[in-house]
C-alpha cells in the first residue's frame, strides 16, 4: 500500500490491486475521487483541477 499527502489531499493506492491501476484521493476523511490511472478518468466521484494536476505530478515523479 502506498499513502502520500500532498496539497491537502491524501492519495492511497495498493500494489497488485485489481485492474485498472487506480488511486483513491481523500480530503478531510472523505473520498474525493477514485481515479483510473490507465484510462485517465474517474471511476467514482469527480476530480477537481488541483487533484488532476497533483496526480500528473505524482505520475511524472514515478510515485503512482
Language model segments and positions:
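Metal-centered catalytic cores of metalloenzymes
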Residues: 1-21, 25-64
